[in-house]
Design a protein with these regions (language model features):
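Absolute protein N-terminus
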Residues: 1-3
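Compact, glycine-rich, soluble single-domain proteins
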Residues: 6-57, 86
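C-terminal structural segments of small proteins and small subunits
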Residues: 53-87
Length: 87
């Protein structure tokens, strides 16, 4: 299962939001991948997430595979929509 999400927080997917995304992803029994354009990375690796350098207004796709896939997608979606609780 996958979902497209728009990055809306002011500074984009920098260190703090990346850490929050990875922390959320690691709570679930699922393989999680995050894509921007043609680049796909491991959603449970902070260094990989930061390499995406997703800026405000850009779209990412979150894909999850495994027993907790649906719950993982919903949790990450809520986090992104909340602007990572930064604003």
């Amino acid at each position: 299962m996958s979902k497209k999400l728009k990055i809306n927080n002011l500074k984009g997917l920098h260190a703090r939001p990346s850490a929050k995304l990875v922390k959320a992803a690691n709570k679930f029994d699922a393989d999680i991948y995050v894509s921007k354009g043609d680049q796909t990375v491991n959603g449970k690796s902070i260094m990989s997430i930061m390499q995406l350098a997703a800026a405000r207004g850009q779209e990412i796709t979150v894909k999850a595979v495994g027993p907790d896939a649906e719950e993982a997608i919903e949790s990450i979606s809520r986090l992104v929509k909340s602007k990572f609780f930064e604003e």
